[in-house]
Amino acid sequence: MQRLSESKKLRGDGWQEKNMRQRLADYVADFLVKKGITDCFMVVGGGAMHLNDALGHKEGLHCTYNHHEQACAMAAEAYARVNNRIAAVCVTTGPGGTNALTGVLGGWLDSIPMLVVSGQVRYDTTARYMQQFTNGLPIRAVGDQ
């Protein structure tokens, strides 16, 4: 005998899509593919681990892994110039995002499209979150750096 949940999955009426939980990272990967993005240039990092996982496993999305974020942005710019299509860039938190800026600026100056996605640390490990516990004293850093 089938369980109710199994029979609903088999019905084909979209029940599964409407009632299943989905990670935000998987939603981002789905969004990119639905918008026609087929290539992503990325550097893996702890702050973007869920994005790395989702993008790397997404069918229809080809990921090219680089050793530096600047290379990712420059590769996305070159990809757009050669293929006349937008590419995505995925980098990790903090310096990962700022390292990509030179390549992003190069694309921006020539109106070359690219979509840059960066990871983010948990909010409860940030200095902004911790200020509520210090009577307003500014904190430079806490937790993840």
Task: Kindly label every feature range from the protein language model.
Residues 14-145:
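N-terminal alpha/beta PP-like core and its mobile active-site loop of ThDP/TPP-dependent enzymes
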